[in-house]
Amino acid sequence: IYNNVQSNMCVDNNKANADNECAADTFAAIKENVYTFWHNYWSSGKFLYHENEELMRRVILSQYLLIVNDSGYIPPAETGLTCNSWYGKAHLEMHYWHMAWAALWGHPELLEKSFDWYISILPEAKKNAARNGYRGARWTKMVSYTGKDCPSKIAPLLIWQQPHIINMLQMVLDCYNNDVHFKKKTDRYMHKYWILVQETAEFMEDYLVYNIASDTFNIESPVIPVQERHLPEDTRNPVFE
C-alpha cells in the first residue's frame, strides 16, 4: 500500500521449508520498512499547530489518508484506494488536488516519485496530441496506467489538467532550492524532468488559436470547461482555463 516497501523475494526449490522462510523474511522486511517510513514521515516535514483539537485531528487524519491513498508511483484513482468510483481510473486533473500539498508540507520526495510515471507515458501523450493535430504532449483526463486515454464523452475535451504537471514540478523544485538538504538535487532534477515542461508547454501553445483581427490568442470550441456543464461546441475561452 505504501509503495515504500522493498522486499527481496527468495526462491529455493531444494528446501521443503523455502516458502515459509521466504514469507517470514519478506514479512520482517515489510514490517521494518513500514515502521521506518511512518517514523520518518511523522518526524519530518511541516506541521500546523492550533489549539482547536478538531482542527488538529483533521490535519493529522488528512495527512495519513492522503499518504496511504495517493502517494504511489502512479497517480491515484479518483477516490484513492477507498472505493471504485469513476471506473477505478486515475484522473490527471485530480493528481494536483491529491498530492501537490506534499511539496508545501515538506515532503517533496513523495510527490516527485510519481513524476517518473509521466516520463514513462510521454510517448502516449505525444501520440494523443498528434491525433488531435497538435505538437507536444497532451495529457489525458481519465487515463490507464499505461497512458491510454480511457473511453469517455467528457475526458477527451477537458484541458484544465494540462499545466498541473508543470506546476507540481515547480513546487518540488522550489522545495529543493530552499532547503540545504535538497539543494544538491536541483541540477539532476531539472535535467531529468525538463522534457515534461517542454512537451507540455508546446501543446499548450499550439492549442491556442490566433485571431488576426483582435490580435489575441483564444481557446476555441470544442472544449469542455472545468464545470463539465456546458456544451463543448458552444464553449469558447472558458474563464478558469
Language-model features and meaning:
Residues 52-60, 75-76, 89-93, 105-112, ...:
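Conserved structured core elements
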Residues 64-73, 110, 114-130, 196-212:
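Long, well-ordered core segments of solenoidal/helical folds
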Residues 1-88, 108, 118-124:
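Acidic/polar, glycine-enriched structural segments that form the non-catalytic walls/loops
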Residues 11-15, 114-116, 181-194, 209:
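Composition- and surface-driven signal marking solvent-exposed, interaction-prone regions
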Residues 43-46, 65, 97-110, 164-182, ...:
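Well-ordered alpha-helical scaffold segments within catalytic/enzyme domains
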Residues 77-89, 134-190, 205-241:
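The feature captures the catalytic groove of carbohydrate-active enzymes
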Residues 59, 92-137:
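Carboxylate/His-rich catalytic cores and anion/metal-binding grooves
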Residues 8, 67, 103, 202, ...:
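Residue-level marker of positions within ordered structural domains that often coincide
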